[in-house]
UniProtKB/Swiss-Prot annotation:
Origin species: Lachnoclostridium phytofermentans (strain ATCC 700394 / DSM 18823 / ISDg)
Function: NAD-binding protein involved in the addition of a carboxymethylaminomethyl (cmnm) group at the wobble position (U34) of certain tRNAs, forming tRNA-cmnm(5)s(2)U34.
Classification lineage: Bacteria, Bacillati, Bacillota, Clostridia, Lachnospirales
Name used for this protein in its record: tRNA uridine 5-carboxymethylaminomethyl modification enzyme MnmG
Binding site for FAD: G14, A15, G16, H17, A18, G19
Cystine bridges: none
Similarity section: Belongs to the MnmG family.
One Pfam family from the record: SAM_GIDA_C
Amino acid sequence: MTNLYEAYDVVVVGAGHAGCEAALACARLGFNTIMLTVSMDNIALMPCNPNIGGTSKGHLVREIDALGGEMGKNIDKTYIQSKMLNQSKGPAVHSLRAQADKMDYCREMRKVVENTDNLTLRQDEVIDILTENNEVTGVKVYSGGVYPCKVVILCTGVYLNARCIYGETSHYTGPNGLPSANHLTESLKKLGIEMYRFKTGTPARIDKRSIDFSKMEEQFGDEKVVPFSFINNPEDIEKEQISCWLTYTNENTHDIIRDNIHRSPLYSGNIKGTGPRYCPSIEDKVVKFPDKDRHQVFIEPEGNYTNEMYISGMSSSLPEDVQFKMYRSVSGLENAKIVRNAYAIEYDCINPMQLKSSLEFMSINGLFSGGQFNGSSGYEEAAAQGLMAGINAARKLSGKEPIVLDRSQAYIGVLIDDLVTKETHEPYRMMTSRAEYRLILRQDNADQRLTRIGHEIGLISEDRYEHLIDKERMIKEEMMRLENSLIGASKEVQEILEGLGTTTLKTGTTLAELVRRPELTYAALAPLDKNREPLPEEVITQVEINFKYDGYIKRQEHQVEQFKKLEGKKIPEDLDYSDVPSLRIEAKQKLNQIKPSSVGQASRISGVSPADISVLLVYLEQIRRKK
């Protein structure tokens, strides 16, 4: 007999980074939500790298925060080292990255989850998605019970039929020996959902007491910490930071790998899943880049109160005996004691082209999904999708239109658009190069781009919204003041400019023109700016960027206007592309499969040509005229 449990508005399956953001969003928007997980002890687990952020990923975390998500706040509480990457480059690619105390990160996120109204946490494995007439009605769990619900959000991570592999050893288990979920895939297949088999990997963990750090280069965090969350001030989160360390592989390391490559499951055929192109294992690096005589290896602490060190850059699935030799061949690791073996992990995920841009399945009403289940990789990509899936699930229950961020609004928009529009046969990783409008999608202005939307959704408080309005007012007023502040070509001014290493003046100018000079900073011009009032650092940053990159920003804004024209041409959901004359057969098939919401999205589909788009535009105009 089936045990009928309490009914919920929303069931979230999985309590990783995607699941937590999805569940918190739904609960905070007033919907009775339950989050089901195979292990309550591992909420927001970081099973691989011990960091949040990095190139493009830092952008995602700040966007999550700007919309009202939790990841940025949580890493600000639990970081052990913070660094702004790419500072020698332009602001478009500046990316914040923080080492996390993994255990603290889990604990703090669990505190938030357990203290959120409308949110219940329950340990159990979901084995079946229940539907009626292609509409979600509930989920069945391993214990035999059923949770009736209106919406389900699947955030299963790498746990579906997960198999961990190193050398000839393999076992069906999730990361770090956690239980895998071995029943849900069959339920999804019965619903007609197309599944993929992907693979990822992780390096060994080594006891820090066995490492000779004197042979390595110490890597410090930044003295001036930048928070991930816009609600935090730098001074509020400052703390003593822990160093990371840099070493390198060598020819001996590479010889050990080459001599044993036949024992790697990647090359023996024991691994069937497709791995991430941009996060290769060390054996992949050695095989694919034979001309490189060394590869970087970063030694990263996993927390304040553990001896485990993460060996970044050396993920592997080689046998245990080879791992010992390989790691011990690296300078500083000659006496390394492995406390956890490196391994690869295979798992089931979906073809994300079955999803709408709202992250709801096209074929099943009320079924949403987010995270690595959607074919992406990374904690940050997962959290971003989980947040958007949660927001749109809540809006569906409210009878509201979904929130779909486009490619000119956010990296989150680029991420989701790529997943649902472009075919991917490997784990998708976010990169700055994927964003066409990255100069206006900087991490420093995520709040100005997205906090209004978060406020309209209901995830941003009135106080936080007012803080944004005040910040924007200060930016505008300071820019106007600098534009109107005249500087004469006096002897004193010329001496100051000479001292700053910049060209002296021939005639008078404004402070704004001086700020525009690449070699000058706002701070350096203080001796020429007697009327300057103290301003928050975040305001000064915006003022400087707006002046220095004004021409480039305007050019990109013009490109966005052109982009918006095609995005604004909406396509009816029920359009059958088979009826569109003159469309090529491949285009008809791809368009019917993906069901793009706009002509802009249609133009980005692989196999749809510019000529097909012209045909489609003519057809849509004919439909419009008939109406």
